[in-house]
Swiss-Prot record:
Pfam families: Ribosomal_L30
Subunit record text: Part of the 50S ribosomal subunit.
GO BP, sorted A to Z: translation
Gene source species: Corynebacterium glutamicum (strain R)
Keyword line: Ribonucleoprotein, Ribosomal protein
Cellular component terms per the entry's GO annotation: cytosolic large ribosomal subunit
Protein name, as recorded: Large ribosomal subunit protein uL30
HAMAP family in alphabetical order: Ribosomal_uL30_B
InterPro entries referenced in this protein's UniProt entry, alphabetically: Ribo_uL30_ferredoxin-like_sf (IPR036919), Ribosomal_uL30_bac-type (IPR005996), Ribosomal_uL30_ferredoxin-like (IPR016082)
Xref: NCBIfam families: rpmD_bact (TIGR01308)
Length: 61
C-alpha cells in the first residue's frame, strides 16, 4: 500500500518543524503531489502536518 500526499496549504507562518516535515515528505509547493510508502515514520510526519496536506491511499508501491 502506498500513500498519495498533496500539499494544499502554504508554509508561510507555520512552525519550522512543520516545514521540515513537509520537506522530508518531499513536498515543496502548493498542489505538489508525492507518493510515499505506508510506514509508521511517514504516518507520523503526516499526522504532524495534516492541516496542510491531503492524503489518499493508492494501490501498489
Amino acid at each position: 500500500m502506498a500513500l498519495k500526499i498533496t500539499q494544499i496549504k502554504g508554509t508561510v507562518g507555520t512552525k519550522p518543524k512543520h516545514r521540515d516535515n513537509l520537506r522530508s515528505l518531499g513536498l515543496k509547493r502548493i498542489r505538489h503531489t508525492v507518493i510515499r510508502p505506508d510506514t509508521p515514520e511517514v504516518r507520523g510526519m503526516i499526522l504532524a502536518v495534516r492541516h496542510l496536506i491531503v492524503v489518499e491511499e493508492v494501490a501498489g508501491e
